[in-house]
Each structure stands twice: as structure tokens, then as C-alpha cells.
């Protein structure tokens, strides 16, 4: 029997709700068709936003949405996406499929979407091909209430009051598609650009996000922090509130990533092993951040993460459309548990991407919509948002099919909500073994337990023909004991227990 020990009174750090954030880019069918269909569409919508998608996202309590990219952000010129739609400039989306971008979804539409979702706004600015003035004027357009050219332009375009802007990314992937810069050059550009990302609302400051590393580029993290902290007052912590990190799971590598649906046991464990590498990245980048920011004033912002496979056969290679199986449910559960356990440093994360792109929570086909296994994991994990991480540990054994791709059989995180409920999320990575869990809750009297689970065979997925193949089901097989609870977690599953 496996032992899980939980100490609900030993609180460690707050799990920011933003850890459960999402990412939307002008890429494939994410924005257009997936979220925005226009006011004249026969698909039910409110001001152009699909009502089915909006309601589904509200159900999982989406806390923050990042936009407009991604690589698209550093070729996006925001003034092309305001004003009457018929006069907006068209452009070629050179990064993603070479399609025409008509800019019918712009700043006003994004904030309309955030308002409908009830979520915070994370805008990524254009440092790669844009100017300091362009970035400064965008922030002014969005947030300034007084008399100014940009505030007047916003009012002319139909929005009298400014919006609230919660996060602003000063460039994206500037080590690559955002300008192919070296870390010292980018850091100096960051210093200059961020100066003009002004806080016009002292009671609602913009949190500035600096472009961090790609995967394990620890030199980038070190050099960027060194340059931004040089000749900078200590209390300004490099003039940043967050430093980003991007990491994707590519089962077979970057060039040939592997199928989203056709994989064997070896690739299953290989994928989960790569998902677990997120913890190493957080720890090693976090160690470098500790040198410059021991008080953890700078949040680690994992604003692109998830599984990236070879696109579905017959789809545009530039649209990055892929299916979603129980493997993705496990990748999501593993990764979110890691974020929870490192919530002292990880302050926001954004799954790539929200609809129809990469590890989506929603897929659409015309008027039809399906919820993916990943969606259902976010649904179960939403109770961790703004809860307190508490001390927990679980006994594990190593499993897998080859020595190189071994993984622990179980992974967990536990939080306590404001109402005192203990929320346990547990993943079983094994393809063939259930585990009986003896759970000890220290100094805690268990009165009630509710459970829910997502589980199935590793290839199971939801399709437009069978949309409910994978879904959240009740889990009632929990026994109360003198020391806590006892239950058996099935193979290939993600479990959430609420204990009171």
C-alpha cells in the first residue's frame, strides 16, 4: 500500500489563480472560428464571441488570457486592429500558414472577450519589429483616462473609459522569432521599452513581463537578469514583475514531433518523462533568479507550455491543430501539480493554446464544439486557484519501458481553500497498475469526502462523433479511516478529492 502524508496546517505558498491561465494567438483557428465568429455568424455569439466557448471557459474559471502571441506578437501593429472593421489593414500572417489576417479581432475585441470571460488581460507587446513609441501608445490607448491623443482615439472608436490591463509582455521569444537577439542586447532593449509601459492607474499597476528563456537556456536567464539589474535600484528588481519561460513536450523531438493519437507504451512514458522535466527547469532557472531576487519579487511566468505534436493529417501545417488524448490529460495534471508545488516562484502559466491549437482545452468544427481531456483536468484543478499549498509527500516507485524514460508512478499536490476544504490532485502515470493509497491527514478530522476522476485507455479522446468519451466522473470509492482516508487510484488517471 502506498502512503500519502498531508499536513493541512503546514501552509507553504499561495497558488496564484493565474497559474491556471491560457494563451490565445492569431494562429490557425484559435481566434477566428475558435473564439471569434463575428456578429453576423449563424453560430450563437455575443458581440462576435462564440457563446458556447465563452460559457465553457467560464466554467473552468479561466483567470487570465494572453494575446496576441506568441510569434505573431512581434509582427503585430496594434493600430491596424482598431477602428471600423472595413477600414482595418490586412496583413499576411507570415509565421502561421501564410494566411490573410484581416485584423477584425483587435484591441477592443480582446477586451470584450476578457469582459465576457471575467478574466484578467495579458497583452504581449511588439518589441521585435515595433517601436518604443508604438508600445507606449498602445498602453496609453488601453489604460489612460485623461486627455491625450491615444485616449481621444479610443473614445472616438467607441470606448469612453479605459480598460484594466493586468499584465504586459515586453516582447516574446526575442531569442528567436522575436528578433534573434542575444541576451545582453535584449535586456538593454527591455530596459528601454519597459520605461514607457507606464502605469496610469496607481491602484491597478501593470505587471511587466520580461522575455525569459527557451527551455534550458540558463545563460539567457543569467545574462538578462544581470543586465536588467545593473545600475537599477534594488527595490525595482530589474524593472520587471515577471520573467517568462517557454517549454513544450515534443515526444520525438522538434523536427518530427510524433502523432497526437498514434503512439505506443514507450512514447507514452517518454512524453510523461518530458513533462516532468518542467520541474528541473523551474528549479534551475529559479536558482538563478534567487541570486538576483532572493525575496521572490519577480514571478516565473511559464506563459507557453503544453504538448506539441505533428499536426493532424489533412490540416494546414501552419495551423498547429492536434487532437487530445488521455496522454494530454496526464501531461496537464503532472504539469499543474508541479506549478502548484513551486508556487512560491511560479506566479502565472498559460497553456498553449486555448482553442484549436496545440494542447487545446476546446476544439471546434463549424458550430460544433468538444471539450478535450485537458479541459476536464483544468475543471478538476480549478479549486486550487488562490488556495494555499500545503505540505504533502507520497511514496513512489519508478516505472516505464526503457531505462532512459523512467517516471515516478504517482505525482500529487494539495491545497487548502479559504473555506477550509482540502483539495488533493493526484496522477497515476502507470498504464497497467492501480495503486491503493493510504492517506494520512495530520491533525485533521475527516467528515466528508467528494471525488471526481478522469481516466481511460491511453488513446481515448473526444471526437465530434463521440464528444463524451473522456469526461469527469464521480469517484466515490473512498473510505474514511482513523488517520485520514483510503482509496485506490486507477491506472492512467487524474483524480481530485475534496476533503472536509
Regions found by a protein language model. Name each.
Residues 246:
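Histidine-centered active-site/metal-ligand motif
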Residues 249-269, 315:
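Active-site His/acidic residue clusters
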Residues 1-242, 275-279, 283-311, 315-500:
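Non-catalytic accessory regions flanking glycosidase/transglycosidase catalytic cores in CAZymes
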Amino acid at each position: 500500500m502506498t502512503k500519502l502524508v498531508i499536513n493541512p496546517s503546514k501552509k507553504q505558498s499561495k497558488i496564484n489563480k493565474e497559474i491556471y491561465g491560457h494563451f490565445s494567438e492569431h494562429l490557425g483557428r484559435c481566434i477566428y472560428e475558435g473564439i471569434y465568429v463575428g456578429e453576423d455568424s449563424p453560430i450563437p455569439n455575443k458581440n462576435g464571441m462564440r457563446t458556447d466557448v465563452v460559457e465553457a471557459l467560464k466554467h473552468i474559471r479561466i483567470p487570465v488570457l494572453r494575446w496576441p502571441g506568441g510569434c505573431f506578437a512581434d509582427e503585430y501593429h496594434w493600430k491596424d486592429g482598431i477602428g471600423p472593421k472595413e477600414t482595418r489593414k490586412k496583413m499576411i500572417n507570415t509565421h502561421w500558414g501564410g494566411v490573410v489576417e484581416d485584423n477584425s479581432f483587435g484591441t477592443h475585441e480582446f477586451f470584450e472577450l476578457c469582459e465576457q470571460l471575467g478574466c484578467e488581460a495579458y497583452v504581449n507587446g511588439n518589441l521585435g519589429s515595433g517601436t518604443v513609441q508604438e508600445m507606449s501608445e498602445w498602453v496609453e490607448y488601453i489604460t489612460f483616462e485623461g486627455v491625450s491623443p491615444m485616449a481621444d482615439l479610443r473614445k472616438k472608436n467607441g470606448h469612453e473609459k479605459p480598460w484594466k490591463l493586468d499584465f504586459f509582455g515586453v516582447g516574446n521569444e526575442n531569442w528567436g522569432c522575436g528578433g534573434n537577439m542575444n541576451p545582453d542586447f535584449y535586456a538593454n532593449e527591455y530596459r528601454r521599452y519597459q520605461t514607457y509601459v507606464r502605469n496610469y492607474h496607481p491602484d491597478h499597476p501593470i505587471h511587466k513581463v520580461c522575455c525569459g528563456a527557451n527551455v534550458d537556456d540558463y545563460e539567457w536567464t543569467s545574462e538578462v537578469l544581470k543586465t536588467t539589474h545593473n545600475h537599477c535600484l534594488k527595490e525595482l528588481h530589474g524593472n520587471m514583475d515577471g520573467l517568462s519561460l517557454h517549454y513544450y513536450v515534443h515526444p520525438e523531438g522538434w523536427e518530427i514531433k510524433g502523432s497526437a493519437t498514434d503512439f505506443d507504451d514507450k512514447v507514452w512514458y517518454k512524453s510523461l518523462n518530458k513533462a516532468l522535466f518542467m520541474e528541473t527547469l523551474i528549479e534551475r532557472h529559479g536558482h538563478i533568479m534567487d541570486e538576483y531576487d532572493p525575496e521572490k519579487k519577480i514571478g516565473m511566468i511559464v506563459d507557453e507550455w503544453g504538448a506539441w505534436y505533428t499536426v493532424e493529417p489533412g490540416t494546414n501545417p501552419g495551423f498547429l491543430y492536434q487532437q487530445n488524448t488521455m496522454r494530454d490529460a496526464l501531461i496537464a495534471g503532472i504539469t499543474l501539480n508541479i506549478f502548484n508545488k513551486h508556487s512560491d516562484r511560479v506566479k502565472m502559466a498559460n497553456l498553449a493554446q486555448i482553442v484549436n491549437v496545440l494542447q487545446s482545452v476546446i476544439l471546434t468544427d463549424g458550430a460544433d464544439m468538444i471539450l478535450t481531456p485537458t479541459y476536464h483536468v483544468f475543471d478538476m484543478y480549478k479549486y486550487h486557484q488562490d488556495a494555499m499549498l500545503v505540505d504533502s509527500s507520497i511514496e513512489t516507485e519508478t516505472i516505464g519501458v526503457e531505462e532512459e524514460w523512467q517516471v515516478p508512478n504517482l505525482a500529487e499536490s494539495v491545497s487548502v481553500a479559504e473555506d477550509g476544504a482540502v483539495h488533493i490532485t493526484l496522477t497515476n502515470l502507470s498504464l497497467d497498475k492501480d495503486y491503493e493509497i493510504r492517506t494520512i491527514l495530520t491533525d485533521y478530522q475527516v467528515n466528508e469526502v467528494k471525488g471526481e476522476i478522469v481516466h481511460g485507455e491511453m488513446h481515448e479522446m473526444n471526437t465530434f462523433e463521440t464528444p463524451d468519451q473522456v469526461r469527469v466522473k464521480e469517484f466515490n470509492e473512498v473510505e474514511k479511516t482513523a488517520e485520514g482516508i483510503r482509496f485506490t487510484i486507477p491506472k492512467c488517471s487524474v483524480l481530485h478529492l475534496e476533503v472536509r
